[in-house]
Amino acid sequence: MAGSPLHIELHANLFATDSAVYGDWNRLFAGCWDRAVCREFGGVEILGPNHTDHLLYLICHAYKHFLHSGFGLRQVADMALYANAWGSEICWEQVLEKCLQIRGAHFAATLFAVAERYLTFDPVRACYPASWKEYALETDPLLEDLFGAGIFGGATESRRHSSNMTLNAVTEGKPNLLSQMLPPKRKLEKQFPYLQDKGWLLPVAWTQRLWRYATNLRQDNDPTEAVKIGNQRVALLRQYKIID
């Protein structure tokens, strides 16, 4: 309906299969539809993931955005509310084991520590096990990143562009300034659709991209600031043991 505040986003996969960083996370949800549960909303029955899979997805979705350019406090609030409501039906050990597989256990446990300290997360009500608390690290650096990120890491264009460094650090173990300025073809295909069938025009896309940088320099879109943010966030990935 025109003018409706409802926004529906549809994806063929939970996580983009062509991503070198999180493309294989879909395996964590193998068989999820065999475990699906039916819920009723407004008299309509809807089939969806069970509570364990649902919480795991909330964590992984936040984690994905964290590896890009960050996310805001709202997603932490969503996790806290969901855990409070359905914690007794969540297999916390299974969620933890899967978080460990993707090096996200310290990240997830620290998010719940943030939610307990500053939001409404109630560990007793959520049946939150002590085994999770052992993985929680210092909350302040993560909280500061949450406040600086905007809703989905888009607080500034500089922050958005810093994702090239964090993603490269995950795939290659270190940030790469060259990849920040001259990303590979697959990362530019949405911005420059002609690359999909004319890959040999990649140098042209690089030139256009750098020209846009040069002609649109402003306080929130500064390559130097993007590199600074990228280095800070790569250090954060190390602090939460996402990379070595």
Please name every model-derived segment.
Residues 1-244:
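Conserved NTP-donor binding/palm subdomain of two-metal-ion nucleotidyltransferases/polymerases, i.e.
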